[in-house]
């Protein structure tokens, strides 16, 4: 199964490098040279092999094998990048999940009151933070004191909010 790992937001320079906004976990692994990425463009699927990867001003900069100038890649601006969900170099530990498993889950308080749906995730260094869209947008830290149960199969998450978390 493929998961969306990013979006080509722009080109960079004239030698065919692209600026990618990642919305994936494990980008250091997924974007390494030699990795294959799928770009869906105008109802066609194109497989590219990563030739080089670096981070520049918060964006992931990729160059693909065989692409050496801006004209060969510019038409992909705005397109999404996909990769196989299960990657041979990624092992999930206990209580670890792919972002694609968490995004879209409905979050409930421990009294079964719905809060909203996870729409995005960002890393803080200490722990991930889930952006949950309900009546407002809430920032829910993925920590043991808050997140009590994750049911990937039913796409539900139960939390015990800390005081002030949902204000």
From Swiss-Prot:
Signal peptide stretch: none
GO biological process, one term: rRNA processing
One protein family per Pfam: RimM
Record-annotated PRC barrel domain positions: 94-165
Keywords: Chaperone, Cytoplasm, Ribosome biogenesis, rRNA processing
A GO term from the CC aspect: ribosome
Gene Ontology MF terms in the entry: ribosome binding
Protein location: Cytoplasm
Entry's free-text remark on domains: The PRC barrel domain binds ribosomal protein uS19.
Self-association state and partner proteins as the record states: Binds ribosomal protein uS19.
Function recorded in the entry: An accessory protein needed during the final step in the assembly of 30S ribosomal subunit, possibly for assembly of the head region. Essential for efficient processing of 16S rRNA. May be needed both before and after RbfA during the maturation of 16S rRNA. It has affinity for free ribosomal 30S subunits but not for 70S ribosomes.
Family of the protein in this entry: Belongs to the RimM family.
Protein name: Ribosome maturation factor RimM
Organism annotation: Staphylococcus epidermidis (strain ATCC 35984 / DSM 28319 / BCRC 17069 / CCUG 31568 / BM 3577 / RP62A)
Biological classification of the source: Bacteria, Bacillati, Bacillota, Bacilli, Bacillales
Gene: rimM
């Amino acid at each position: 199964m493929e998961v969306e790992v990013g979006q080509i937001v722009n080109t960079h320079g004239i030698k065919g490098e692209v600026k990618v906004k990642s919305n994936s976990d494990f980008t250091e692994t997924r974007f390494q040279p030699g990795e294959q990425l799928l770009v869906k463009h105008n109802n066609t699927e194109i497989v590219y092999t990563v030739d080089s990867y670096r981070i520049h001003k918060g964006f992931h900069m990729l160059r693909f094998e065989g692409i050496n100038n801006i004209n060969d890649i510019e038409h992909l601006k705005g397109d999404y990048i996909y990769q196989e969900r299960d990657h041979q170099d990624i092992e999930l530990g206990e209580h670890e999940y792919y972002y694609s498993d968490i995004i879209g889950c409905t979050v409930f308080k421990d009294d079964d009151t719905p809060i909203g749906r996870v729409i995005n995730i960002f890393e803080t260094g200490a722990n991930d933070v889930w952006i949950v869209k309900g009546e407002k947008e809430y920032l829910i830290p993925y920590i043991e004191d808050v997140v009590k149960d994750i049911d990937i199969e039913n796409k539900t998450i139960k939390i015990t909010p800390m005081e002030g978390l949902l204000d």
